[in-house]
């Protein structure tokens, strides 16, 4: 995805774009900071900040008071460093063959999930000639990534020796919730207790973690008892409710997906639209062509199921969504719509446009998937904090 800097002219009319409201990011970080109490906020900007652009989001989050940044992979962390980010950055997912040396050289904190990874990090630190900052990721019930209880004692042994040798600095202990979006689920408390117990066990065996963190977005907003010294929100940074049934939870969605109307044309009753003529006009009407399709992140499964906001009115998509384009029914009285007018596919919803949550419900998925889908030819433009479209 291409990115334009704040305040640059909009992309050519043939292009779709996501407009990212950095003021919303700023607002959301401040909401999360207040809810976190004395705990720090680690802003998760993995996957290119959930499709919002890692560098602009990272800068905004740090300016709003986030203490650190979290990403999945080392290349994501290094991209932040190359972009001038000097704040603490933690990377926690490492495929086989990962070279940890560049991360250590760039002062990127590395989370390890096994004895093997820890030994690789220690070896890389010796190679670089620099102390590595390490967090231990433990499995407290998700059964995904992380050191299990059975392997934890031997990992602590390696950790203690490496720390004594000056190869590593032991920074944190982290885990991830199974039922974060179900705040009252008793398993959340069990995971919190397991993490606390593993911290105590480590201290009794010569390893003292500086911080522990467990809370994702929903827990950061609803379970202050599980905050430890740091919370690790992701989706809430971008203004999407981590518990949709609770409403917006005081958050402001940051992403709007839009494109210009590329063509306006009239059709007669009985005329079919797009591949297979799955939609046939039941009256004389006017159609609008939108230059965005499934190659750009508009799911083909949404064919004939979504509305698009044009000139303050919702217009229904008709016919098949194609690779590069789809068609909307503007209605027989569409004299107000012209080529170049904005078509809002989804956004915050404040002006009646569909939202990412609307798409998620139609697709039987989550809004995380929706906002990470715009890609390829979709350009990205930013509204600085304090400016609205």
UniProtKB/Swiss-Prot annotation:
PANTHER family: ALANINE RACEMASE, ALANINE RACEMASE, CATABOLIC-RELATED
Function: Catalyzes the interconversion of L-alanine and D-alanine. Overexpression due to a natural mutation in the promoter is responsible for mediating resistance to D-cycloserine (DCS) in mycobacteria.
Lineage, opening ranks: Bacteria, Bacillati, Actinomycetota, Actinomycetes, Mycobacteriales
E.C. number(s) listed in UniProt: 5.1.1.1
HAMAP family from the UniProt entry: Ala_racemase
Active site (UniProt): 46, 275
One Pfam assignment: Ala_racemase_C
Pathway(s) where this gene product acts: Amino-acid biosynthesis; D-alanine biosynthesis; D-alanine from L-alanine: step 1/1
InterPro entries: Ala_racemase, Ala_racemase/Decarboxylase_C, Ala_racemase_C, Ala_racemase_N, Ala_racemase_pyridoxalP-BS, PLP-binding_barrel
Catalysed reactions, semicolon-separated: L-alanine = D-alanine
GO CC annotation: cytosol
One Gene Ontology molecular-function label: pyridoxal phosphate binding
Biological processes annotated in GO: D-alanine biosynthetic process; peptidoglycan biosynthetic process; response to antibiotic
The protein's name: Alanine racemase
Similarity comment text for this entry: Belongs to the alanine racemase family.
Enzyme type, top EC level: isomerase
Positions carrying N6-(pyridoxal phosphate)lysine: 46
Gene3D superfamilies: Alanine racemase, Lyase, Ornithine Decarboxylase, Chain A, domain 1
Cofactor names: pyridoxal 5'-phosphate
Keyword Isomerase: yes
Positions contributing to substrate binding: 144, 323
The entry's keywords: Antibiotic resistance, Isomerase, Pyridoxal phosphate
């Amino acid at each position: 995805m291409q990115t334009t800097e704040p305040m640059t002219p909009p992309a050519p009319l043939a292009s779709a774009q996501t407009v990212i409201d950095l003021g919303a990011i700023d607002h959301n970080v401040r909401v999360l900071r207040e809810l976190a109490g004395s705990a720090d906020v680690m802003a998760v900007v993995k996957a290119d900040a959930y499709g919002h652009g890692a560098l602009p989001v990272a800068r905004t989050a740090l300016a709003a008071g986030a203490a650190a940044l979290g990403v999945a992979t080392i290349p994501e962390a290094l991209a932040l460093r190359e972009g001038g980010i000097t704040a603490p950055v933690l990377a926690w997912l490492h495929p086989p063959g990962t070279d940890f040396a560049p991360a250590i050289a760039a002062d990127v904190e590395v989370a390890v999930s096994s004895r093997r990874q820890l030994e690789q990090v220690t070896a890389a630190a010796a190679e670089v000639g620099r102390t590595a900052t390490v967090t231990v990721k433990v499995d407290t019930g998700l059964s995904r990534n992380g050191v299990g209880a059975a392997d934890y004692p031997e990992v602590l042994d390696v950790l203690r020796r490496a720390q004594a040798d000056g190869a590593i600095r032991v920074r944190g202990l982290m885990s991830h919730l199974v039922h974060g979006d179900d705040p009252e689920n008793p398993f959340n408390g069990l995971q919190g207790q397991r993490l606390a117990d593993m911290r105590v066990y480590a201290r009794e065996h010569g390893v003292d973690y500086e911080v522990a963190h467990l809370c994702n977005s929903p827990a950061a907003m609803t379970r202050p008892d599980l905050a430890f010294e740091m919370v690790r929100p992701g989706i809430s940074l971008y203004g999407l409710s981590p518990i949709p049934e609770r409403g917006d939870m005081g958050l402001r969605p940051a992403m709007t997906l839009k494109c210009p109307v590329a063509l306006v044309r009239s059709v007669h009753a009985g005329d079919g639209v797009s591949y297979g003529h799955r939609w046939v006009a039941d009256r004389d009407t006017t159609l609008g062509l939108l230059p965005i399709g499934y190659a750009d992140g508009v799911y083909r499964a949404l064919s004939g199921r979504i509305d698009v906001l044009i000139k303050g009115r919702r217009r229904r998509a008709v016919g098949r969504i194609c690779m590069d384009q789809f068609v909307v029914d503007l209605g027989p009285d569409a004299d107000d719509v012209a080529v170049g007018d904005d078509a809002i596919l989804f956004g915050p919803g404040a002006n009646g446009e569909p939202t990412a949550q609307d798409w998620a419900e139609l697709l039987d998925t989550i809004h995380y998937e929706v906002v990470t889908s715009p890609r390829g030819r979709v350009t990205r433009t930013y509204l600085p904090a304090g400016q609205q479209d």
